[in-house]
Amino acid sequence: MDRGSALPAEISPQLLRPLAYRVLSKKYGLHIKSDGLAQLAKFIGNAFGVDWRRSAETMQFLERFAAIWREQERGLFVDALGVDAVTQELRERNKTAKQRRPARARETTLDALVRPTEAYSAVESSGGDVTATEPMDEDTVREEPLDWTHYFKVIDTFSQQQFTYDVTKRRYRLVQQRESAAGPLSTLLRIPSLEANLAQFPTRYHLVRDRVLRNASFQNDDVYNPLSSMQQLQQQLDAGGAPLASTAYMSITQIKNLLGRDGKNFLLLGLIRKDSKGFWSLEDPSGSIEIDISETYPTKGTYYVPGCIVLAEGIYSSAGNRFRVSSITHPPGERREAFLEAIGNLDLLGIHGPSNESYISRLDKELKIRLHYLEKELTDHRFVFLGGNIFLDDTMTETALAKLFDVLEHDPPTVLVLPGSFTSTPIYPSSDSKSSSSTAAYRANFDALAKLLSKYERLINETTFVFIPGDNDPWGSMAYLGVAGTLPQHPIPGDFVTKVNRICKHVVWGSNPTRIAYLSQELVIMRDDMCNRFKRNSIIFPTVEEEQKQEYMLLQQELQDDERSSDLSISQLIKSRDQLPASVQESRKIVKTILDQQHLSPFTSQVRPITWDYDYTLHLSPIPSTMIICDPTAPKYDVTYNGCKSINPGSFLHKRSVNYTEYTPSLRKATEEEIVV
């Protein structure tokens, strides 16, 4: 039988794994995904037949395969799509080699590596079994142990790869980052594009809409129970996601479809804001409509601010083209695993390998399981998040940092996060020659910090320092003078921190916000006075005001009655055993609002401006494993919602105490710590 007539062999991926590990993993440092291994086994079985294991040409093929894979920069993970592309490239190169070489030389080209040779074609023609079934001891070759440092990465906002959401195809599409001869665009002063501004709201809207439609309450568009569905939806969320009755399914109507349907009930999804006349309106990509919230009952436990995307239920009135809202709520949240499954486990952050035009990185399920088990083993890893406003120009702060470093030096954490602002007054340009400028003083403060750190050998050598800028830090402070500026915020310029860089072995000057990829977890860190902003811009509903007024009057009456009865027991003074402290209720409102909106700044541009080109870096799709919102204006909290642990370490110095939070990734447990200064 000639070489082209060899029968293919069916190879089990598990039989090929030891050989592929020796060549691809051990020699070239590649990780083989399960689908990639199956595709590779199928190709080798068709090309080399039953003697694929004893043939030296199989090894040569894997060597060529690995070389082309690295040549094309396809990343560390070998998947099925990449295997198909590389094998096709091998065939194309073989054709080119055939055309350029004489006939005799062609026998030694790559064609011999993708077809059975005459040596084992004879075995097949003699009646050999075409299925490789010989057992192989897999214990002889074990999986390569994972190094946790390969899966630990601090991701700067301006270096984060960009995926845009294709509305028509309902999938993410990679956007290639352009670079200039002067350097990456993130380092250049440029004006955001108008296209990014126009796409900002529709992208966010459709992400929320698709998330809502994946909810079980919206799966049946034929049945709709108006004026009660919102209440039942809230009951479902409070009950932990139990399915609704068959009569409670809801459907979303576009605003443009309200015309001519006077007096009917509808459920709308849109962004709430004030229009040019100063009235509240609801907006979606199809249009905008004025809303009447005088009789609206919002669901409790969340903030409603201009810029939030909400579900509003009510009656359309053609008189004045108004929508009278009866109830309003935030879109139902979605767990991280459910979102990743819906988008095909895309590696949006490029943690397991950067994506490019010819290769899209995905999260391998087997690898995620291995990383999860590795997390459980690394029980000594700790992340320490300090409170915000570490004012280095304050002598009390230097004393507090010294006491903190004394404690951490005995057992250095894996990561130490220091949120700004790092000066009590904003940095501004000064031309006064009689006194040092604010920039010189700012540099001197970091030089003093470097001098302090030099006393702690273990800390500066074993810990990764992550600095997050605040409102008073350069260069944004020069334009906004300490007022909250545009998001995201650039890292602190390197000219101010040269001595800290020399002292610390591992230091990262992060943006605001910054993401940390740690094994199977994703952490989002942001420094923002979000609590005060929510309170200042919260929408006032007349029905809620009336309820609060009645509760206040009732409380006053009860207090007067209590004064008359001096022998009341403590159980009679407690109105509800389920009543939570105000700080707990406040923290839950903040966390639920942010995670339901799946955006770190769910405000309009008038409230908190955003750099249009980088709005995608503020999206929480999927929600992170852990979210750290450093907000000195809010109470310290540790809240878990939809599987996302949310932490606020509070203010760094409060009543002569140093505040910080210690997070253990192996247990996903946070502990609040204090040190008296």
Swiss-Prot record:
Protein localization: Nucleus
The answer to whether UniProt assigns keyword Phosphoprotein to this entry is no
Q: Which UniProt keywords are present, listed alphabetically?
A: DNA replication, DNA-binding, Nucleus
Pfam families per the UniProt record, alphabetical: DNA_pol_E_B (PF04042)
Q: Which InterPro entries match?
A: DNA_pol_a/d/e_bsu (IPR007185), POLE2 (IPR016266)
Task: Provide a Gene Ontology MF annotation, just one.
Answer: DNA-directed DNA polymerase activity
Which biological process, per GO, is one annotated for this protein?
A: error-prone translesion synthesis
**Keyword flag DNA-binding:** yes
- Tell me where on the tree of life, at the top rank, the source sits: Eukaryota
A single Gene Ontology CC annotation of this entry is:
epsilon DNA polymerase complex
Q: Which PANTHER family match?
A: DNA POLYMERASE EPSILON SUBUNIT 2, DNA POLYMERASE EPSILON SUBUNIT B
Task: Report the protein's function.
Answer: As accessory component of the DNA polymerase epsilon (DNA polymerase II) participates in chromosomal DNA replication.
Look up the further comments and give them.
Answer: In eukaryotes there are five DNA polymerases: alpha, beta, gamma, delta, and epsilon which are responsible for different reactions of DNA synthesis.
> What protein family is recorded?
Belongs to the DNA polymerase epsilon subunit B family.
Complex and partners: Heterotetramer. Consists of four subunits: POL2, DPB2, DPB3 and DPB4.
**Which protein is depicted?**
DNA polymerase epsilon subunit B
Q: Which organism is it from?
A: Eremothecium gossypii (strain ATCC 10895 / CBS 109.51 / FGSC 9923 / NRRL Y-1056)
Q: Which gene codes for it?
A: DPB2
